[in-house]
């Protein structure tokens, strides 16, 4: 079953999914905060709080920069005005997680290129059985993401190459 949000200029007043019908919501939603009503946000928060699964894919980290609970769900996000006030820029350096509080905007990516993904947590049910390192096909490598990062475990990272407008850090690629 698929629930699709109304188009860009569509009417969101009738968009009221029954989240409880789903074990997991997979989202690539990227639009301004104002489109979701407070009641729609509250129903989604309740769904997740009650154990509903939520997978934020690709541009879903751009959505809802002002929605505190959403940002707690995704851990880190980019664009749409996020900056140091949104939370630290999390990355790995010398094998350690760095919550960098330096000022700056959130969200960047270079040109689409293949990149190596490193699974840092190999005993998690999501990464168990996967190779420690593997190549991802050409794609945008999101970097410089910021957010509260509370209760966030970074399972995999990717080197954000400065030669491709990257940060020069091991950026989070897969988080739970």
What are the functions of these language-model segments?
Residues 1-22:
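Aromatic-Pro/Gly-enriched surface loop or interdomain linker
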Residues 2-5, 23-28, 48, 53-58, ...:
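Structural recognition of the beta-strand scaffold that forms the well-ordered cores
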Residues 8-12, 30-35, 54, 60-64, ...:
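Solvent-exposed loop/turn segments at secondary-structure junctions
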Residues 11-14, 41-42, 140-142, 172-173:
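A generic local structural motif
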Residues 15, 34-37, 168:
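A conditional alpha-helix N-cap/helix-loop micro-motif detector
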Residues 17-21, 48-50, 64, 146-149, ...:
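Extracellular/periplasmic catalytic domains that process cell-envelope and extracellular macromolecules
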Residues 34-125:
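A glycine-rich, often tryptophan-bearing local segment used as a flexible ligand/cofactor-contacting loop or short
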Residues 89-176:
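Catalytic beta-strand/loop cores that center a nucleophilic Ser/Cys/Thr
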């Amino acid at each position: 079953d698929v629930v699709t949000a109304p188009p860009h200029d569509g009417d969101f007043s009738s968009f009221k999914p029954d989240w409880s019908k789903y074990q997991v919501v997979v989202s690539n939603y990227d639009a301004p905060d104002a489109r979701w009503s407070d009641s729609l946000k509250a129903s989604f928060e309740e769904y997740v709080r009650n154990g509903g699964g939520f997978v934020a894919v690709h541009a879903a980290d751009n959505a809802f920069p002002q929605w505190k609970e959403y940002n707690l769900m995704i851990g880190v996000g980019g664009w749409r005005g996020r900056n140091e006030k949104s939370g630290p820029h999390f990355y790995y350096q010398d094998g350690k997680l760095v919550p960098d509080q330096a000022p700056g905007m959130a969200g960047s990516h270079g040109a689409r290129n293949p990149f190596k993904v490193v699974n840092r947590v190999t005993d998690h049910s999501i990464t168990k059985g996967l190779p420690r390192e593997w190549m991802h096909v050409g794609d945008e490598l999101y970097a410089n993401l910021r957010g509260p990062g509370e209760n966030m475990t970074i399972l995999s990272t990717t080197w954000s190459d400065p030669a491709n407008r990257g940060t020069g850090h091991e950026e989070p690629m897969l988080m739970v």
